[in-house]
């Protein structure tokens, strides 16, 4: 292996070795005359290569061949899974979705030697049947996918032996690569699970830090993987952990050590001193607390509120003493989280009490606005002498004990409709216009309105019965209804369920029954001029009222076919009938 980075790992004699690309590639030792622009261009090229990284399964007929899970350019995690072989010339590709509602789901498809993709076993079977393939069967193609946990465990078993074997060979590499990378990745580097491993990573090579990153990823497991969201900058994926790259920050951090050898040494020393607190801070910002090495696999989720408290506490501690901040953000994360939880609970109780006091003060102020002026004066004097909690209690007690004259309440709240004087009187008749009373002439059409014109309520009830119903069905039920409920006073007090039983031969009997009861009540109580203002009466009922009950047939333009016939007949015979 060269010093340019860990490109691939040999997995022994298990078959074709899958390619495992590190999410962070090592930069070779630059010469002394390396310029600032060259370093920036190299880092940018490395990021683009890693972003477009894809692992595919090789098309060899090896029964022990391991199958890598492909990583799409839009973002899919790469891993390996040990499976049976696929037919010669075919490729099996597995992609995992990282975004959307189906994040974490695996898509399996096979690529034929001709380059055709098959995403389901049915389409593959149709293809084989169409081409007359006899050597291949749909059962030879496996569309199932192992779980991510199983894939990780197999990858760990296959790769850890090779990782430990190459660990000794990489320990003699230069420390400049590690320090350069820790400086460039200051904002995005994930720390080891304990302070002892962090000290070991300083002395080891770049490969050692990559090994520690792989161990950390096993502790995080599927929790971080399912929380992947597309960031604004470039993102490289290493076993499901998103690492955001900021080119500007990387170039800015690299600008200090590429000018001269003396400055490079000072920056490297500074990177060693700052690597631990910066790594801990980036870990806290990711809202995942990784416990000590003894409790591997357990993760502590940090909420957004706790994260804000952590930031505030770090600022205060850093202003006081740097030693205290490093001690708080180092390996003792469990104690820090417990202290942080207690502080969060205290602050939450304080804010809750403050919000309660503010809410009670607002209620008391609103209630006091309705009190008499002398009560307000006494209440304000007592409020000045009392504490905030006793102020609220005193204001509520005054509001409950002191009484206001009944006349003021009636004058303010009670309307004229509900006053006692109005209730003692009988129901006032509707104040209609002083229409000219007239008797509509009998026509050859024999409409029911010609019989009920003398009682507007009965005529309007008939229009409700005839609405979207034939006269043969509605008129017999109408006479039964008028026998049981002869007036509006009786109908307004009737139970709508009884009326509904009577109207069952007609459609919409429940709706008609409720409409009749409410219409009868408004007919007696509401001040109306035309019946279209009442509940349940439309244009048909209003036109019938104006033609048969009121002498306004000349101003009416009916739309009902029966009313149209009667209206036309009136216009043709109004001179013979001496109608004005």
Curated annotation (Swiss-Prot):
InterPro entries linked: DNA-bd_dom_sf, DNA_glycosylase, MBD4, MeCP2/MBD4, Methyl_CpG_DNA-bd
DNA damage listed as a keyword: yes
Chain segments annotated as transmembrane: none
Keyword vocabulary terms for this entry: Disease variant, DNA damage, DNA repair, DNA-binding, Hydrolase, Nucleus, Phosphoprotein
EC number from the UniProt entry: 3.2.2.-
Alphabetized SUPFAM superfamilies for the sequence: DNA-binding domain, DNA-glycosylase
UniProt-annotated catalytic positions: 560
Class of this enzyme: hydrolase
A Pfam entry, by short name: MBD
GO molecular function, one term: DNA binding
Consequence recorded when altering residue 468 to W: In UVM1; loss of DNA N-glycosylase activity
Major localisation: nucleus
Compartments where found: Nucleus
GO biological process, one term: depyrimidination
Gene Ontology, cellular component aspect: nuclear speck; nucleoplasm; nucleus
Domain MBD: from-to ranges: 76-148
Region (Disordered): 1-36
Chain positions with Phosphoserine modification: 318, 428
Subunit architecture: Interacts with MLH1.
UniProt disease link: Tumor predisposition syndrome 2: An autosomal recessive condition characterized by predisposition to develop a variety of tumors or malignancies, including acute myeloid leukemia, myelodysplastic syndrome, colorectal adenomatous polyposis and carcinoma, and uveal melanoma.
Function: Mismatch-specific DNA N-glycosylase involved in DNA repair. Has thymine glycosylase activity and is specific for G:T mismatches within methylated and unmethylated CpG sites. Can also remove uracil or 5-fluorouracil in G:U mismatches. Has no lyase activity. Was first identified as methyl-CpG-binding protein.
Name this protein carries in UniProt: Methyl-CpG-binding domain protein 4
Organism the protein comes from: Homo sapiens (Human)
């Amino acid at each position: 292996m060269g010093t340019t980075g860990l490109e691939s790992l040999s997995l022994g004699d298990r078959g074709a070795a899958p390619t495992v690309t590190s999410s962070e590639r090592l930069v070779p030792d630059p010469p002394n005359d390396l310029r600032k622009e060259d370093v920036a261009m190299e880092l940018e090229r490395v990021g683009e290569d890693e972003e477009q990284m894809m692992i595919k399964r090789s098309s060899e007929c090896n029964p022990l061949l391991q199958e890598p899970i492909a990583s799409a350019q839009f973002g899919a995690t790469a891993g390996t899974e040990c499976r049976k072989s696929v037919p010669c010339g075919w490729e099996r590709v597995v992609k995992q979705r990282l975004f959307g509602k189906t994040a974490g789901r695996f898509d399996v498809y096979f690529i034929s030697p001709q380059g055709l993709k098959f995403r389901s076993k049915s389409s593959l079977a149709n293809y084989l049947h169409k081409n007359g393939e006899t050597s291949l069967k749909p059962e030879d193609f496996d569309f199932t996918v192992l779980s991510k946990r199983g894939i990780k465990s197999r990858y760990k078993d296959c790769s850890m032996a090779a990782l430990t074997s190459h660990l000794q060979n990489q320990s003699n590499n230069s420390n400049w690569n590690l320090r350069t990378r820790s400086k460039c990745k200051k904002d995005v580097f994930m720390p080891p699970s304990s302070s002892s491993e962090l000290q070991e990573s300083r002395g080891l090579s770049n490969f050692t830090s990559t090994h520690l990153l792989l161990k950390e990823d096993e502790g995080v497991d599927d929790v971080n993987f399912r929380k992947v969201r597309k960031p604004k900058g470039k993102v490289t994926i290493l076993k499901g952990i998103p690492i955001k790259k900021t080119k500007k920050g990387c170039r800015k951090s690299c600008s200090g050590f590429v000018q001269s050898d003396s400055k490079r040494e000072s920056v490297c020393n500074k990177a060693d001193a700052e690597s631990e607190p910066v790594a801990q801070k980036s870990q806290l910002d990711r809202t995942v607390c990784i416990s000590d090495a003894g409790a591997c696999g357990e993760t502590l989720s940090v909420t957004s509120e706790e994260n804000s408290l952590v930031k505030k506490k770090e600022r205060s501690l850093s202003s006081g003493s740097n030693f205290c901040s490093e001690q708080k953000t180092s390996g003792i994360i469990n104690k820090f989280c417990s202290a942080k939880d207690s502080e969060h609970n205290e602050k939450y109780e304080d804010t809750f009490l403050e919000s309660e006091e503010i809410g009670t003060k607002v209620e008391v102020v609103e209630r006091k606005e309705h009190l008499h002026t002398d009560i307000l004066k006494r209440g304000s004097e007592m409020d000045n002498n009392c504490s905030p909690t006793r102020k609220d209690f005193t204001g509520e007690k005054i509001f409950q004990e002191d009484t206001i004259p009944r006349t003021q309440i009636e004058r303010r709240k009670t309307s004229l409709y509900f006053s006692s004087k109005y209730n003692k009187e009988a129901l006032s008749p509707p104040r209609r216009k002083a229409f000219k009373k007239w008797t509509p002439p009998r026509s050859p059409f024999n409409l029911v309105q010609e019989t009920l014109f003398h009682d507007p309520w009965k005529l309007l009830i008939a229009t409700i019965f005839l609405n979207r119903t034939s006269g043969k069905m509605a008129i017999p039920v109408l006479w039964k209804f008028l026998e049981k409920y002869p007036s509006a006073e009786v109908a307004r007090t009737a139970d709508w369920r009884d009326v509904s039983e009577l109207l069952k031969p007609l459609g919409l009997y429940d709706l008609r029954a409720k409409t009749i009861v409410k219409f009868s009540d408004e007919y007696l109580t509401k001040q109306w001029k035309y019946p279209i203002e009442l509940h349940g009466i439309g244009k048909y009922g209003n036109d019938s009222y104006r033609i048969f009950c009121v002498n306004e047939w000349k101003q009416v333009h009916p739309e009902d076919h029966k009313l149209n016939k009667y209206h036309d007949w009136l216009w043709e015979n109004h001179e013979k009938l001496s109608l004005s």
